[in-house]
């Protein structure tokens, strides 16, 4: 199995290291030519969604990636990656792929000082530590979206 990690901005190295510890081959996507490689999944990392979207368009990567996602490429998205996938962003203009039927709110947990740690259950996995650093909040999900974890208010 080979997983591509979007590596134009954000926390891509952390995702690569985690996948490599699991024995998964990774490839970095930095330019349009990198999309010509074969890969079985995609990671859209945390970072700054506005910057990532702009860079993907400037590097001519946006449309080819969107097409792969629409064709069914499995995607793991964290933070900014989730914002890129969301069909709706309630407190900002939509700049992403709009392929996941969710509505998110950017920076919903406030400023950097409002960051927090939470241990919660993930369906099929168990208790897992989670960090929320200016993270997006999922306000609503489409009928076909399965919720795997929720943070208690």
Predicted features, each with a name:
Residues 1-58, 63-68:
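N-terminal beta1-alpha1 cap of cysteine-dependent amidohydrolase-like domains
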Residues 1-9, 32-36, 54-55, 84-91, ...:
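Short low-complexity stretches enriched in small and charged residues
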Residues 34-36, 67-68, 76, 122-125, ...:
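Solvent-exposed alpha-helices and their adjacent loops that cap or buttress functional pockets
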Residues 106-153:
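Amide-donor transfer/coupling interface in amidating biosynthetic enzymes
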